[in-house]
Amino acid sequence: MTSAPRPCEFERTCSALASPELIRLITEIDDNGTIPPRGLARTLPDLSPHQLRHAAAQAHTLGLVRTRRGLSLTESGTQLAEVYDEAARWARAHDYPGVTNTFVTRVRATLQLLGSADVSVRRQERNGELGLVVSLEAIESLTGPKNAVESWIARHGGADPTATEAFEGARQAA
């Protein structure tokens, strides 16, 4: 049995996995299968070339995709898609971050909430970045998404700190 990830590793991984472009890429491949070679822009036309490059590079660095005959998910990528589904189910059940949101917004907000150090405190919380109040009941039920992320980290090693820092630096520069 593996131990739970260290808090900083958990927070870093939640932050890396909460990239909207990465969420879109992983769920697109999970839902619709391999993206053909040079088909990424056609598949996700609302993302800029920079966003597409960033998502593909991050997915490669984290070992989520392989490029054999197009872009497809590795075992790690498939299991991450399940983590995203779990996060979205929790968000939908608790109307988080709001009643009408997209899948990406729900997953991102849930991962940001999980990655915040305040969530471990058993009281009503305000998510600083989004300014949302989360009920005690909702926080207590975060065990499903939290366990899913912890399990993914245990199997696949989480997010490499140097890769995460490089991607955050590139994102801020853009």
Describe each model-derived feature in a short phrase.
Residues 1-6, 56, 68:
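Recognition helices and adjacent regulatory flanks at domain boundaries
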Residues 2-26:
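Short alpha-helical segments that sit at the start of domains
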Residues 32-44:
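Short acidic, hydrophobic short linear motifs in intrinsically disordered regions
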Residues 67-90:
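Basic, amphipathic "hinge/linker" alpha-helix immediately C-terminal to the N-terminal HTH DNA-binding motif
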Residues 85-173:
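Amphipathic alpha-helical dimerization/coiled-coil segments
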